[in-house]
Amino acid sequence: MDFHPLVVHFPIAFLTVYSLFELIRFQRVLEKPYWFFVKKVLIIVGWAGSLVAALTGFIASGWVIDGPRIFLMHRSFALLTIILSTVSAILYLKNKHNKVLIIFALLILISITITGGLGGAMVRGTTFDPLMAPIFKLLGVY
């Protein structure tokens, strides 16, 4: 059974919400005592879930090293998302006020969007989302 579709959406949700929370910089929100704990849970659970999602993806693909360009790009951006979330989690645990986390949050959102678009295109075809068309052309998956 292919568990990848069942597992993959949880880390996407956690990392997306973490990234959006990291980008919110309203003083009133930052003063909440639980704010940093919530973000810490989101980044750590999202990171751990992304590892499980990647593992189930590799299992579903039969541990294939090579394949169609869209598959290779999907895998590359998934690994980029894992790397970005790993660095973000480490930076966050060292200093939750690090301004570099804002840049990483934006990069995580971009990486998740591209990874998800490529994954959706593998299942639904490259014309399922017209907003992804410029990215698909840029990446050469058409």
What are these regions (language model features)?
Residues 1-142:
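Polytopic transmembrane helical bundles with strong interfacial aromatic enrichment
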